[in-house]
Amino acid sequence: MATAASADLDYVRTLGADTVLDYEKQRFDGSATRVDVVLDTIGADTQQRSLRMLKPGGILVSVVSPVPESTQKRYGIRAAYFYVGVTTARLNKIAELFDGGELHTDVGTVLPLEQARTTHEMLGGAPHKCGKIVLSVAA
């Protein structure tokens, strides 16, 4: 199960999701389906609603914030906080994977640094193309 905006539903299906919910029209926690694993990239209320979607013994992996031990016990789940520290070596490896075609991403919008405010508005829900939003820094 995955969630996406209306405009992105078909794209998310191409990534392999069997069930895709339109989060603009349907709350994911309204589904009767309980899941084994949640990857939380939002946090806050979304994380709380995700906890209720997990099967007993399920796992919540968060890239936003750790889940307190008391919360894990209350829901009968396990949780992991996943954080990748950025280093020059890691960035070089990522660049190598992109250059070799082993890793790719879909870039939807590229804007100059001077339009950083616009990118924040897009992240907050303003219309934009499907894919990553990139700020370009002049050399």
Enumerate the language-model features and the residues they cover:
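Terminal helix/beta-alpha structural elements that buttress the NAD(P)+-binding lobe
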Residues: M1-A139
